[in-house]
């Protein structure tokens, strides 16, 4: 039975290589069966020719071009393996598979991916360019986190590099740092000033400053600028200017050799006070250039007193206690002797002798005998209205005196005119 006639011959379509052999016997069969239809024979031949052309069209003529390319020379050979390529780009792309080089980096901010081929980078960039995909959202979050971490790491590296490569501070940074230290070196604590003098004698190069930063608890930059300012001031004023400015630096040189003694302290104070009028201009112009917010410029310069000051402090500080100074010493329970208000005067207090150190001994107050009227005198008065006993007044007796009657009633008041009733009570007991 002959195959049914159709518009497409599926046998020829599946087996294109048998087109010539299959069409030969079928043609006489068709012609013998239908000799009266020449048009059908013509259509079958046309259909067979069209079917024979289908396989090259479906395959895109690729096998022919590949066979032709295989014949072309391959001058670009891989140095790491036995493969060869027609073009230089193909060889370069292949070598990157051996070396792991990825020169194509993603330019999206925060994305750190790199690729060895440009087409891979193009395909990856679509993830960032398409905002609707879930992968894009996840990639954005990951990229943002990576960018933040990279930014913090870069900031830490920059701060570290800046700290290690920082040049030494310039001189005009703190011009007035050592003003108060030079103005009042006698009242500064010895430990802080000795540290200041030690750093002033040390080498102030940038490397020495880095080594001293770990061992010193003070601000090394402030000390370095202070030392440089002092050296500049020494060069500016100089010791050759005469003895006028000598006391500015005398105490500092005492501190360099050791702590100043009390005599040196008194001498420096007397020198500074005797030359206060002469050096007033030198101090004022140095204080004027001090910044208002400088932490070192707030300390008062103690040696700059003037002669016409209203302070009762004498010009020369003596080694002994001054005459008008109160006797400052700890008072015991029975040593508080205050004069009564009747014995206080408005005149100037007389000068006391200089107090010498003496051992403290028991200093008890013994009340003097009263010379008031006795009971017989009161009873012998002619007027009856005056024959009355005075109103008894309870004396102010300390609690310890009450507990220790052997010590006597040492009253808190040192008045010599005690009340009659107080003495009577003391005599009764």
Swiss-Prot record:
Q: Name one GO molecular function term.
A: zinc ion binding
Q: Where is the composition biased (Basic and acidic residues)?
A: 275-284
Compositionally biased residues, Low complexity: 35-52, 292-306, 406-422
Q: InterPro entries per the record?
A: creA/MIG_C2H2-ZnF (IPR051007), Znf_C2H2_sf (IPR036236), Znf_C2H2_type (IPR013087)
Sequence segments annotated as region (Disordered) = 1-71, 169-189, 269-333, 351-391, 406-429
Where in the sequence does UniProt note compositional bias of the Polar residues kind? 8-34
Its GO biological process annotations read: carbon catabolite repression of transcription from RNA polymerase II promoter by glucose
* Localization (cell): Nucleus
Post-translational modification (record): Ubiquitinated. Deubiquitinated by creB, probably to control its activity or amount.
Matching entries from SMART domains are given as: ZnF_C2H2
Keyword Zinc-finger in the entry? The reply is: yes
GO CC annotation terms, alphabetical? cytoplasm; nucleus
Q: Which residues form the C2H2-type zinc fingers?
A: 76-98, 104-128
Query: What keywords were assigned to this record?
Result: DNA-binding, Metal-binding, Nucleus, Repeat, Repressor, Transcription, Transcription regulation, Ubl conjugation, Zinc, Zinc-finger
Q: Which family does it belong to?
A: Belongs to the creA/MIG C2H2-type zinc-finger protein family.
Q: Describe its partners and assembly state.
A: Interacts with creB.
Q: What does this protein do?
A: Transcription regulator component of the regulatory network controlling carbon source utilization through ubiquitination and deubiquitination involving creA, creB, creC, creD and acrB. Represses the transcription of the alcR, alcA and aldA genes by binding to a GC-rich region in their promoter. Also plays a role in response to carbon starvation and the control of extracellular proteases activity.
This protein's name: DNA-binding protein creA
State the organism named in the record. Answer: Aspergillus oryzae (strain ATCC 42149 / RIB 40)
């Amino acid at each position: 039975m002959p195959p049914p006639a159709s518009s497409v011959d599926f046998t020829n379509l599946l087996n294109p290589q048998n087109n010539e052999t299959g069409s030969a016997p079928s043609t006489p069969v068709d012609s013998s069966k239908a000799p009266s239809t020449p048009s059908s024979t013509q259509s079958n031949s046309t259909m067979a020719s069209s079917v024979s052309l289908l396989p090259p069209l479906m395959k895109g003529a690729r096998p022919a071009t590949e066979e032709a390319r295989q014949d072309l020379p391959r001058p670009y050979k891989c140095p790491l393996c036995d493969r060869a390529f027609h073009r230089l780009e193909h060889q370069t792309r292949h070598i990157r598979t051996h070396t792991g080089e990825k020169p194509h980096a993603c330019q999206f901010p925060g994305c750190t991916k790199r690729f060895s081929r440009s087409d891979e980078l193009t395909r990856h960039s679509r993830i960032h360019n398409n905002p609707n995909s879930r992968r894009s959202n996840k990639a954005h979050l990951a990229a943002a986190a990576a960018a933040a971490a990279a930014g913090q790491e870069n900031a830490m590296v920059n701060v570290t590099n800046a700290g290690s490569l920082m040049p030494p501070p310039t001189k005009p940074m703190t011009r007035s740092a050592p003003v108060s230290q030079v103005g009042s070196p006698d009242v500064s604590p010895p430990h802080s000033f000795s540290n200041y003098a030690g750093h002033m004698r040390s080498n102030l190069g940038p490397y020495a400053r880095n080594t001293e930063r770990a061992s010193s608890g003070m601000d090394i930059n402030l000390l370095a600028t202070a030392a440089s300012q002092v050296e500049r001031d020494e060069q500016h004023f100089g010791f050759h200017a005469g003895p006028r400015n000598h006391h500015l630096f005398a105490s500092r040189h005492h501190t360099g050799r050791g702590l100043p003694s009390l005599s040196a302290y008194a001498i420096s104070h007397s020198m500074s006070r005797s030359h206060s009028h002469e050096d007033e201009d030198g101090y004022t112009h140095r204080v004027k250039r001090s910044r208002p917010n400088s932490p070192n410029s707030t300390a008062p310069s103690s040696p700059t007193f003037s002669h016409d000051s209203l302070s009762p402090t004498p010009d020369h500080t003596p080694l002994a206690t001054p005459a008008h100074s109160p006797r400052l010493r700890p008072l015991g329970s029975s040593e508080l002797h205050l004069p009564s208000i009747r014995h206080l005067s408005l005149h100037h207090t007389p000068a006391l002798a200089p107090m010498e150190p003496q051992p403290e001994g028991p200093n008890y107050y013994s009340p003097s005998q009263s010379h008031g009227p006795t009971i017989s005198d009161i009873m012998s008065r002619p007027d009856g209205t005056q024959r009355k006993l005075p109103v008894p007044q309870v004396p102010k007796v300390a609690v310890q005196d009450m507990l220790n009657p052997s010590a006597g009633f040492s009253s808190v008041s040192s008045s010599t005119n005690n009340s009659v009733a107080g003495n009577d009570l003391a005599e009764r007991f």
